[in-house]
Amino acid sequence: MIHFAIPALLFAHLTIAQVIIIAEPKTNVTILSPKSICTFDTPAEGVKLDRKELDAAVGELKGSITDLQFGALSAALSHSKIKDKKEAAMFMAHIWHNSAGLKEKRELYCMVDLERCKEPYKGVLPGRVYYGRGYMSLATEGNYREASQALFKDDRLLKNPELVAEDECISWRVAIFFWERNVQDAAKSGKFGETTKRVNSAECASGDKAANDIARRRFGYYKVFLKAFGVKEEEAKEEGCY
């Protein structure tokens, strides 16, 4: 991967709320804010999201998405293996559910009582607790190591697991890494339930109405994103989970 020096002067007039997006095919650098710079070593051949379409879906779900979130999501998806809006809608439905509408990027149980999470989520490095972080909740030392090596060819996420929650670009890249590694082949079936089974198989337990109702809620989100992305409603296949 090529590293680029970003002139400090470029950020001199910016506040953290402001966003600059630079689509630069030759350098694969997207500048989101002074604290979030996306770099990629893969070509931009993934799906392109339309802001108005995404806003329509998020609005129908009575939520919102910030410029920073959209910029990072757009950059990460464009460099992903997600090629069409049907799969993007599946991805966004699970993200919406797992992050409580793009609001939560840390495992709430551990935020309330970190001490109880230290033992199950401990690692080799002292002081690090590898509980669930990010839009797809990356958890355990092994998964942090695997994601870090796959995305950056180093151990930065092991050394600083908080990056998965704090850096918007990394949050989305880790979520897409999880999707491509664990869910994407199921998404190709076109059956949304198959993707739910990969994301959280417990929701597909036979005869467990409460769990199945959560899975149905995910499917409801999928239909909202699918409609907003301009995909025909009959494309929404529910089967594969309960």
Which residues make up each language-model segment?
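Acidic helix/loop microenvironments that form the catalytic cleft of cell-wall polysaccharide enzymes
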Residues: 95-98, 187-210
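Sec/Tat-exported extracytoplasmic proteins
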Residues: 58-62, 74-81, 95-99, 139-142, ...
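Low-complexity, Gly/Ser/Thr/Pro-rich intrinsically disordered linker/tail segments
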Residues: 202, 206-242
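GST-like fold's C-terminal all-alpha helical module
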Residues: 171-192
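N-terminal signal peptide
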Residues: 9-29
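Surface-exposed patches in mature extracellular/periplasmic domains of secreted proteins
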Residues: 65, 79-91, 104-108, 185-196, ...
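Peptidoglycan-targeting cell-wall enzymes and recognition modules
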Residues: 38-65, 72, 86-178
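Classical eukaryotic N-terminal signal peptides for Sec-dependent ER targeting/secretion
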Residues: 1-10
